[in-house]
Each structure stands twice: as structure tokens, then as C-alpha cells.
Amino acid sequence: MEGEKNWIVVPTWRIPGRLEKWHSLVKYLKHRTKELQQVSYVPHHKVGWAWWTCSRVIFPLKEEAYLEVQGYWNLTPERGFLSSYAVRLTWYKRSFYTDVTPDVADQLLHGSYFSCFTANEVRRAIRGEKILSYCNYPSAHEGQVPSLQFLALRVIQEGKDGSQGESATRKQRRRNNRRSIRLARKNNNRAQQGSSQPLAPRTHFPGLAEVLGILA
């Protein structure tokens, strides 16, 4: 008698293409800039029995918690193993785990990775001094109710005066985002060859949804 099929259903976020850009960016930030040095990247050939998993990226967080971005492929075997891709975002601590949305995942990551404004920046701004720290993960603050201090620092960082639209600072940050991703895609061979070039500047991380190309 044929045994019953057991199905495991998990929430996933569909993406339009392959995951090379995501993998390259993780390796770039892990090995090149060292900003994700503690992150574990597990490629598909080391995953083991889960043949539908193309990668696992595990971010250690505070208080012994973890955020895992698990990439899936070949999700439509009944249609001939089409090249369909998706990701699953999971937060877990010891024996408890839960799936999270991309915006929550960004907030969790920003609590441990990519620098933000320090507590002294408000006093520096009031005294008219130069701001020494900036938020390199702006998308992690979306969906939150920001404080007036944070909004003021964001205005200073972005260089907006309320009438002239985008400043060179915001445009530069967008260029930095594109540059980080572009360098990540070309960095794999260079890193393997032991390049002696200096480390890249601190990265402005555009957020998981943008990097992965998550489709809402």
C-alpha cells in the first residue's frame, strides 16, 4: 500500500530571477569589507539533503538569536523543474522560530549590522558641528515612527532643504548602493586571487527586498 505524502508548507517570497546578485553581495561584504564577517554563507552543494535549497545565509543577532535567508529553487517540479526562485526569511532563537517579513528582517539586521547614528550626533548637530556617523541602512527604519532627532539627522545626512529636491548627498548614497552591488558581482574572482587593493568604504545597504528583488 502506497504511503501517504506529507507536505510541509512554509511562507516564501517570490523573486523574479536568480540569486547570484544576493550571493555575490554577501560574499563581498563578508570577505572584502568585513561588514558581514560573522555571517555564515552555505552554498547549495553544502546544504545536504534539502535539494530544493540553493543557499542559506545565517546572520547571528544579539542575545543568541539568528536571522536566516534561505533561497529556494526548482519550486515547480510538477511543471518540469522550471527556474522559479523564492526566499524564506526566518528568525529563530534556540528551539523557537518564526517567519518574518522583509521589513521586519531589515529592522532585525540593522540592530546588529551596518552603522547608524550615534547618541552624540544630536548634540553635535545642535552645536553646528560636523556629523561623524551616518545611517547606512535607511530602509530598516521604514514602517517605524521616527523620533524628531532621527528625522533631523536624516535631513542633515540627505542634505535636503525642503525646496530643491534631492541633493548630491542622497544621489551619492544611491550611487554607493549601486556601486556596492556592482562590485559584489565582480568581486568573487578578485577575492580568490588575494587582491592587495584597500578595503572598500562602508556600505550603504539598500535592504533585503531591493537586493533580492522580492515581489510583493
Swiss-Prot record:
Residues with PTM Phosphothreonine: T98
Sequence motif HCCH motif, location on chain: 110-141
Alphabetic keyword roster: AIDS, Host cell membrane, Host cytoplasm, Host membrane, Host-virus interaction, Membrane, Phosphoprotein, Ubl conjugation, Ubl conjugation pathway, Virion
Coiled-coil segments on the chain, per record: none
Motif segment (BC-box-like motif): 147-156
Keyword Secreted on entry: no
Record localization: Host cytoplasm; Host cell membrane; Virion
Domain of life: Viruses
Residue(s) carrying Phosphoserine: S147
Modification note: Highly phosphorylated on serine and threonine residues. Polyubiquitinated and degraded by the proteasome in the presence of APOBEC3G.
Expression triggers: Expressed late during infection in a Rev-dependent manner.
Annotated membrane topology: Peripheral membrane protein
Function comment: Counteracts the innate antiviral activity of APOBEC3G. Forms a complex with host APOBEC3G thus preventing the entry of this lethally hypermutating enzyme into progeny virions. Functions as an adapter molecule, recruiting APOBEC3G to the ubiquitin-proteasome machinery. Targets APOBEC3G for degradation through the assembly with elongin BC complex, CUL5 and RBX1. Binds viral RNA and affects the stability of viral nucleoprotein core. May play a role in viral morphology.
Domain commentary: The BC-like-box motif mediates the interaction with elongin BC complex. The HCCH motif (H-x(5)-C-x(18)-C-x(5)-H) mediates the interaction with CUL5.
Record's subunit section: Homomultimer; in vitro and presumably in vivo. Interacts with viral Pr55Gag precursor and human APOBEC3G. The interaction between Vif and APOBEC3G is species-specific, which may play a role in restricting the replication of HIV to humans. Forms an E3 ligase complex by interacting with human CUL5 and elongin BC complex (ELOB and ELOC).
Name of the protein in question: Virion infectivity factor
Organism: Human immunodeficiency virus type 2 subtype B (isolate UC1) (HIV-2)
